[in-house]
Amino acid sequence: MADYLISGGTSYVPDDGLTAQQLFGAGDGLTYNDFLILPGYIDFTADQVDLTSALTKKITLKTPMVSSPMDTVTEASMAIAMALTGGIGIMHHNCTPEFQANEVRKVKKYEQGFITDPVVLSPKHRVRDVFEAKARHGFCGIPITENGKMGSKLAGIISSRDIDFLKSEEHDLALSEIMTRREDLVVAPAGVTLKEANEILQRSKKGKLLPIVNGNDELVAIIARTDLKKNRDYPLASKDAKKQLLCGAAIGTHEDDKYRLDLLVQAGVDAVVLDSSQGNSIFQINMIKFIKEKYQDLQVIAGNVVTAAQAKNLIDAGADALRVGMGSGSICITQEVLACGRPQATAVYKVSEYARRFGVPVIADGGIQTVGHIAKALALGASTVMMGSLLAATTEAPGEYFFSDGIRLKKYRGMGSLDAMDKNVSSQKRYFSEADKIKVAQGVSGAVQDKGSIHKFIPYLIAGIQHSCQDIGAKSLTQVRAMMYSGELKFEKRTMSAQVEGGVHGLHSYEKRLF
């Protein structure tokens, strides 16, 4: 007892851990796995943690999550889901200006619960087409119209009960022979409210789809019973002053991007991201000034940057937020190929510490593999995190599912991959290579395992961030950052063996289910 008893009191507590300034002041480039946050004191529940965060100077989100402007991550479906769950989606620009503007328009015109662009078939399609649609999209409740398109007269509906017990030799049957015909359907008129539609479905007790038709009996939308269940209430939804969902879009920094910008503004875009792998350029500075002169109220997210010196030029030009990251994404090989970039944790801390002096929020872009990485990025000063691979292969991500070795996958590629560059010149412009005869790839193309729906995945991420803040002892992300800058929040570097210890180890086999 006497060997270690020094004092009967507990007023003395030794100084422990490193401040953020000490952690990142040594000159080492650190990633999210290189350190941990030391826990604090808990006197509240996790669900009390406020995750409200600034996306830009004028746009605030209730959850700090942004989907990346990549052509295998964000189009209208992803942007809608992100906004409904409290974040925002940034529409990619590896497409025509008209297509991109139309995707933004879909988000801004979205009415909760109504599906305006469903899979539609015609009576002439075959049963095998339904099975193919089911394999691609994961469902087989499909409206049938006269010409197989929206806006055509409703002819019937195909559901799983119509095809489940058909023999393989019957897969060539025309849908007109087996579908539930129009006269046997319960429909709702255009203009019906979500509440009224819900009541109609409950009363009818027929099927899983409710077609919405206009006065000419033409299909204008559908409502799925499963969607009614999950769309009843989105208290965190990101909306503008007109109660429309928030939506962002990426553009380049070239002269022809000004036309794209005009179309996006006409579509109602809330923020534009100047999409460049290296944002500290005269091209981006000039584009920021042009936008601020022509569309004063439009929020401009500039980047990408990884140093305070880069950030200074974009802030001086009028940027409303900064996107931080260079070469840290899972499909990015910029650091390997060009020897330029910065480890992501260091980049986020250094740029955030500088930008906060001017009231400019930072988006941590790249290197996010787990919910723990999100918590670390936010604790280092980022206001929001941008996710690519973490959201790839969700139901709402663009692309079709395919199977490999029995695993359901979706394609995921970097915008600096040759695959993406070959699709559209916008991807080449992002890396200043549109005029090059020889393209230098700064990304790769691959596949990611099916993660299910955003509506299940994002709530898991939200809960994880809240529990992280609880362990830290902070009731809000604002408090987390205040603790970090004051030096109250402490960190500790991890050796390689510490990282092994912090992961799953010592098991013969295990199943890792996150939610």
UniProtKB/Swiss-Prot annotation:
Q: Return the EC number.
A: 1.1.1.205
Coiled coil (UniProt feature): none
Question: Per UniProt, where does NAD(+) bind?
Answer: 275-277, 325-327
Q: What does this protein do?
A: Catalyzes the conversion of inosine 5'-phosphate (IMP) to xanthosine 5'-phosphate (XMP), the first committed and rate-limiting step in the de novo synthesis of guanine nucleotides, and therefore plays an important role in the regulation of cell growth.
**One GO biological process from the UniProt record?**
GTP biosynthetic process
Q: Which GO terms describe its cellular component?
A: cytosol; nucleus
Enumerate the transmembrane spans. Answer: none
Instruction: Enumerate the catalysed reactions.
Output: IMP + NAD(+) + H2O = XMP + NADH + H(+)
Q: Where does IMP bind?
A: 330, 365-367, 388-389, 412-416, 442
Active site at: 332, 430
Q: Which organism is it from?
A: Xenopus tropicalis
> Can you tell me which family this protein belongs to?
Belongs to the IMPDH/GMPR family.
How it assembles, according to the record, is: Homotetramer.
Activity control, as annotated, is: Mycophenolic acid (MPA) is a non-competitive inhibitor that prevents formation of the closed enzyme conformation by binding to the same site as the amobile flap. In contrast, mizoribine monophosphate (MZP) is a competitive inhibitor that induces the closed conformation. MPA is a potent inhibitor of mammalian IMPDHs but a poor inhibitor of the bacterial enzymes. MZP is a more potent inhibitor of bacterial IMPDH.
The UniProt record lists the CBS domain at 114-173, 179-238
Q: Which cofactor does it need?
A: K(+)
Just give the chief location class: cytoplasm
Amino-acid positions noted as binding K(+) in the UniProt annotation, renumbered to this chain: 327, 329, 332, 501-503
Task: Tell me one GO molecular function of this protein.
Answer: nucleotide binding
Annotated InterPro entries: Aldolase_TIM, CBS_dom, IMP_DH, IMP_DH/GMP_Rdtase_CS, IMP_DH_GMPRt
Q: In which pathway does it act?
A: Purine metabolism; XMP biosynthesis via de novo pathway; XMP from IMP: step 1/1
Q: Which UniProt keywords apply?
A: CBS domain, Cytoplasm, GMP biosynthesis, Metal-binding, NAD, Nucleus, Oxidoreductase, Potassium, Purine biosynthesis, Repeat
Q: What protein does this entry describe?
A: Inosine-5'-monophosphate dehydrogenase 2
